[in-house]
UniProtKB/Swiss-Prot annotation:
Organism phylogeny: Bacteria, Pseudomonadati, Pseudomonadota, Gammaproteobacteria, Alteromonadales
Listed EC numbers: 2.1.1.178
Active-site residues (renumbered): 246
Protein name: Ribosomal RNA small subunit methyltransferase F
Pfam families: Methyltr_RsmB-F (PF01189), Methyltr_RsmF_N (PF17125), Methyltranf_PUA (PF13636), YebU_pre-PUA_dom (PF21150)
Gene Ontology terms for molecular function: RNA binding; rRNA (cytosine-C5-)-methyltransferase activity
Length: 486
């Protein structure tokens, strides 16, 4: 049972909309969340994913605000994170409400008729659900900078970006309050899913509100105000900003947005989200924000606001000096052609027309748009590592296969499709015996369900596993008999 602090109840009773009841709110807080996932369209379409999973007993209940999101039901004794298709990056386990902010950011409106952003900032990214959703909405084009303040969470973010095949990301590790200074008016769109009190998460954490206090809310709202101001300064004139939290009180939600409006006046134009999806008006505030109480859509509590920056505003700090000693250099024409030929001729992959960069013996692929950000900030990770140069040519990197060996594959690519049992063995680091001995084929891409798992060396009678050791799993779940129909 949810532990609802009486001070929280007293505060939220005053803020609950007139058409909602406190009894329904408390009852909703005690109900477990429906399980939800988002299909990763960077690797597979929603329709193809359904076709893949229906023989395994899956049924799909669509989430109205995310065309690739679905509620599912499964045996809760099993860890869905160990599922073969999850490890493969075909889907992300994501709470339905958290799919709202990217949808709001990329939905055209009266103020933003086109959502084809080239440079997007996700200011507080980890663990990566919204980052990878944005990457899918951008179709792995343009540049997505994903920032995370917590060092340990940067590692989780990086792992999820790689697993989902998001190739046009650059990761940073900074306090989000510096972006308005370092990358002033640089982004077409900014998402800030702000750190918050987490009041909306009580359905998955019964103790989330046990120690709630107004002083904590006031303190965190000051941080949120600084973050939204930094995000606004980093936004180009004419760009869109979405501010979201998984909390419910006005101080952390409407109060933060009102602070920005009071500070920058007419440069801040709120956009109504009442038409974002069918039924959105049930959660729309007078300002046009979405204030999602858990009983409205049987989901987590959430808040989403969207605004347009209608004019440039003065920067608060002088432009910082450009940093020197960037460790990457553009590949020479000969180097670039060599790596392109290797990918095309040996792997059957056509490299995208992006920046091929070199660091020592490493070849990397950067988004073209990253060129304008060189020297302006320190980055933890940029784009994808393609290959290492060796005495005998190149050795492809696993992350390049995961990101590029889907829609980029040519019909002549050397691939081997595995059964689910074989795919499980592969992900557990084991070699795969072949039923029929044939001529050895060298490096091949192993796939399951039409999406790549990694590389192997075809030795004629078996596939020698080339999965990086740090990605080998102790347990891989086959879902054939685990998912229950709704």
């Amino acid at each position: 049972m949810a532990q609802l602090n009486q001070n929280f109840i007293d505060t939220i009773t005053q803020e609950l909309p007139a058409h909602l009841s406190m009894d329904d709110f408390i009852a909703a807080c005690d109900r477990p969340l429906r399980r939800s996932i988002r299909v990763n369209t960077l690797k597979i379409s929603a329709d193809d994913f359904k076709t893949l999973m229906q023989p395994k007993g899956w049924t799909f209940d669509p989430i109205p605000w995310c065309k690739d999101g679905f509620w599912i039901s499964y045996d809760e004794e099993e860890q869905l994170g160990n599922a073969l298709e999850h490890i493969q990056g075909l889907f992300y386990i994501q709470e339905a409400s958290s799919m709202l902010p990217p949808t709001a950011l990329f939905t055209p409106s009266a103020f933003t008729p086109s959502a084809k952003w080239q440079c997007v900032l996700d200011l507080a990214s980890a663990p990566g659900s919204k980052t990878t959703q944005i990457a899918a909405l951008m179709h792995n084009s343009g540049l997505l900078i994903a920032n995370e303040y917590s060092a340990s969470r940067v590692k989780v973010l990086h792992a999820n970006v790689l697993r989902m095949g998001a190739s046009h990301c650059a990761l940073t590790h900074f306090d989000g309050r510096v972006f308005g200074e370092y990358l002033y008016e640089s982004f077409d769109a900014v998402l800030i899913d702000a750190p918050c009190g987490g009041e909306g998460t009580v359905r998955k954490d019964a103790d989330a509100l046990k120690h709630w206090s107004l002083n904590d809310v006031l303190a965190i709202s000051e941080t949120q105000k600084a973050l939204i101001e930094s995000a606004f300064l980093a936004l180009k004139p004419g760009g869109s900003l979405v501010y979201s939290t998984c909390t419910l009180n006005r101080l952390e939600n409407q109060g933060v947005c009102e602070y920005l409006k009071q500070t920058y006046g007419d440069a801040v134009q709120f956009e109504s989200l009442s038409d974002l999806f069918e039924g959105a008006e049930r959660a729309t505030t007078p300002e046009g924000f979405l204030h999602v109480w858990p009983q409205i859509y049987d989901s987590e509590g959430f808040f989403v606001a969207k605004l347009t920056k209608t004019a440039s505003v003065p920067r608060l700090q002088p432009e910082p000096t450009l940093q020197k000693n960037f460790p990457f250099t553009p590949a020479t024409t000969k180097q670039a052609q060599g790596i392109k030929d290797y990918f095309q001729q040996d792997l059957g992959i056509s490299l995208p027309d992006d920046l091929i960069m070199v660091r020592d013996d490493e070849f990397w692929l950067f988004p073209h748009e990253f060129r304008d950000f060189i020297g302006r900030m320190r980055f933890q990770r940029i784009g994808i590592k393609l290959a290492d140069s060796t005495k005998h040519g190149f050795k492809v990197r696993h992350e390049a296969i995961i990101a590029l060996a889907g829609k980029q594959l040519s019909p002549t690519a050397k691939t081997v499709d595995l059964s689910d049992v074989e795919a499980k063995e592969y992900l557990m680091g084991r070699d795969i015996s072949l039923n029929t001995a044939v001529k050895a084929q060298g490096e091949v891409i192993v796939c399951y369900g039409g999406a790549p798992l990694g590389m192997a060396k075809h030795l004629g009678n078996r596939l020698k596993n080339n999965l990086p050791r740090d990605l080998v799993k102790d347990k891989v779940l086959l879902l054939s008999e685990q998912i229950k129909s709704l």
